[in-house]
Amino acid sequence: MNELELKYGCNPNQKPARVFMKDGGDLPFTVLNGKPGYINLLDAFNSFPLVRELKEATGLPAAASFKHGSPAGAALGLPLDEVDKQIYFVEPDEALSPIACAYIRARGADRLCSYGDWAALSDECDAATAEYLKGEVSDGIIAPSFSEEALAILKTKKGGKYNIVQMDPAYIPAPQEQKDVFGVTFEQGRNNCKIDESLLANIVTENKNLPDDAKRDMIVSLITLKYTQSNSVCYAKDGQTIGVGAGQQSRIHCTRLAGSKADNWYLRRHPKVLALPFVDGIRRPDRDNAIDVYISDECDDVLADGAWQRVFKERPEPLTVQERKDWVARQSGVTVGSDAFFPFGDNVERARKSGVTYIAEPGGSIRDDNVIETANKYGITMAFTGQRLFHH
């Protein structure tokens, strides 16, 4: 099949719509279930190369959770500890495969933004991954293959309409790519830059310490940024993203947005949050929303009389501003990546408030000296990669 007709494009008025191969060849994917839309497939074909490159760079299974052209989260298939399982809604004794761990981590990076996501897997989707996805609100999934059991589970989602796309793992896109904007065709070479440890050799700070886990997290961050709408900044820890700031016109706003998401990821691990007395039978999205409000400045919206009764068995004690600040201050060992240079040291100032110890950015600002000086002030290790990663 060399063409797939779609219901409409980005919006219902944009008809007709289709995806096709310009050379007349067969499409490199098969729709196993559902009827994926235009935006679904944009997410699918941005997310699959991301997870494939993560797997190639690290040797570990990888997954991503995509929404509207950018990753809400991406992760490697590292085991979950007991706290991970609790905050990601996994049963303590549940057996999980590496690819299931990868997706659970990717979705757990920013569960609120992953609501209605497109899932991407580097490896075969197995029953454990499908079973977890079954309990989440998701629009579809792309993977190189699916086990029979996983396929049967996923086909029960959304009344049998869940979108399942199988990608040819051997497919390599053409070296040139095109897109039309306002009737004008743009053409460029594909961004085939390889992200690996060789990009991290130019450490420009006084602190040269860069352990293997930090190198891994830098690679996770940079590959994620390669497929994130610019401007973008990504915080990573323990083989997963914990905050992605996408599509901001200001670099500092990227750093703040991603930093606030990283703070929220860490606040989900606070003892008060882990002990929240949710009512029996509460749905995962309702828990996510309640936690998001509880750890915010708008906590009264979920703790007020008439509100808390809908989600909690009893009214929990507030998580105060000082408690939140003290908890986030404990965070450390975080890596941050940027798709372009930091123009000012204020980005470093903001990043270190979220526990950032390692930074990877291209360098090249006329104020690089100021950025390096700020990193040195906090003992941060910073590598200049020399590689910009804009994505539009």
Where do the PLM segments sit?
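Glycine- and Gly-Pro-enriched alpha-helical subdomains that act as flexible
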Residues: 72-111, 242-342
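Glycine-rich phosphate/pyrophosphate-binding loops
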Residues: 61-62, 67-72, 76-78, 232, ...
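Active-site-proximal loop/turn and secondary-structure-junction residues that shape catalytic pockets
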Residues: 70, 125, 237-240, 248, ...
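Flexible, glycine/charged-enriched surface loops at secondary-structure junctions
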Residues: 57-65, 165-167, 230-237, 267-278, ...
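Active-site loops and adjacent core secondary-structure elements that bind or stabilize anionic groups
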Residues: 1-199, 214-232
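C-terminal binding/interaction regions
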Residues: 117, 121-122, 135-165, 170-172, ...
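Gly-rich Lys/Arg/Thr-decorated short loops/hinges at beta-loop-alpha junctions or inter-strand turns
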Residues: 23-35, 109-115, 189-208, 285-307, ...
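Conserved helix-loop functional segments at active or binding sites
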Residues: 53, 227, 264-268, 353, ...
